[in-house]
Amino acid sequence: MSIVVKNNIHWVGQRDWEVRDFHGTEYKTLRGSSYNSYLIREEKNVLIDTVDHKFSREFVQNLRNEIDLADIDYIVINHAEEDHAGALTELMAQIPDTPIYCTANAIDSINGHHHHPEWNFNVVKTGDTLDIGNGKQLIFVETPMLHWPDSMMTYLTGDAVLFSNDAFGQHYCDEHLFNDEVDQTELFEQCQRYYANILTPFSRLVTPKITEILGFNLPVDMIATSHGVVWRDNPTQIVELYLKWAADYQEDRITIFYDTMSNNTRMMADAIAQGIAETDPRVAVKIFNVARSDKNEILTNVFRSKGVLVGTSTMNNVMMPKIAGLVEEMTGLRFRNKRASAFGSHGWSGGAVDRLSTRLQDAGFEMSLSLKAKWRPDQDALKLCREHGREIARQWALAPLPQSTVNTVVKEETSATTTADLGPRMQCSVCQWIYDPAKGEPMQDVAPGTPWSEVPDNFLCPECSLGKDVFEELASEAK
């Protein structure tokens, strides 16, 4: 089924509701994706891109229902990756002599994937045009490393449509094609996720390339992407967002992520977050356990943040493998204008936190002091964690802190009145983990200030996973 994009332009792509992994398993496409291909029917008929290789047969059959394949005059390949040009082999088997217009780098990539050097390739460069009749032309603009060396965009005069390739896209599947037809919150979340996880390394190229395209002084009524929606309602809004995201983007936000073996590093993360919130209540703080969280959501939050705190237990003298992998990804994403601090617990040897600090510095983060704890943090260690959080809040503040937080000395022990109001702390009789009503248990949506009597019956001990019935009033507080 085709969809009219504008006048003689039809979408002939493929929706993929079920795909959950992209680029191997590195990008989680939680809302599916689409592979957008466009058929332009003027005096000359032009196909712009194909679809993912796994849909090759369906694509060619659907295309045959729209047009006699022999009537396709030109094929434009904006990008040679398999989710864009994957159906070329199936298509070219039917129309082997059809001219393919692409960049010089794309020829190498296409041959590397499809192994057909005999195809009728035609190299185009920025500013080259192709007349398709009825007073309309295609204008080509090379966009190397956004995000492959072969990438380019194609502009259709007359209709003022920019076929933008991966730029301005999102892995987002919906029955509706246009941006004004879909859920706006979902759409912009997926746009930012896409930019943060795929295009961030090339941010330094985004602004100059957009400036170059704007320099052609061509009107843009629509932006037709390779994935997700077509921008027809105020298409410049996504361009403006890209310019914003490319400019060393940050919000007043701190991301904390960690991995842990015995919940010791997790206790540190919670205490650090409390210290930050006490000192700067305006900052948004998000905490993630990497073993239980969507990696791409973590990286999107890092992209949005002014700083990141990374925690790891020590395992065989080095950091936990999932932390090491995520830090390696952050190195490749080349985040800018962000600060970092490492923390973690260890037993007899240690070593992971120092190694982590070095890796974060190598990744381009401006480093703050790290923090270590031996074995399970006791009350004194947790006090240090909260103070570390306060210091981080002060060092990383984007604006002067509220005067009340500057002048107030935060007390570590809750006042007698407050303690009495919240009731006693409770200790797991199996593993000795302590529930403190003043802190709550954020990982189970138990807010700070929740007395034990109001903790849900399905609550589980974070360490041993046993229920409320194994908890007893802490001996030191028993009356």
Swiss-Prot record:
Fe cation 3 binds at residues 428, 431, 461, 464. It is found in: Cytoplasm. The keyword Zinc does not apply. Fe cation 2 binds at residues 83, 166, 227. The keyword Flavoprotein applies. Residues 30-210 are annotated as: Zinc metallo-hydrolase. Its cofactor is Fe cation; FMN. Gene3D superfamilies: 2.20.28.10, 3.40.50.360, Ribonuclease Z/Hydroxyacylglutathione hydrolase-like. It comes from the Bacteria. GO terms for molecular function: electron transfer activity; FMN binding; identical protein binding; iron ion binding; nitric oxide reductase activity; oxidoreductase activity; oxidoreductase activity, acting on other nitrogenous compounds as donors. Binds 3 Fe cations per monomer. In the N-terminal section; belongs to the zinc metallo-hydrolase group 3 family. This is Anaerobic nitric oxide reductase flavorubredoxin. It comes from Escherichia coli (strain K12). The lineage of its organism: Bacteria, Pseudomonadati, Pseudomonadota, Gammaproteobacteria, Enterobacterales. The gene is norV.
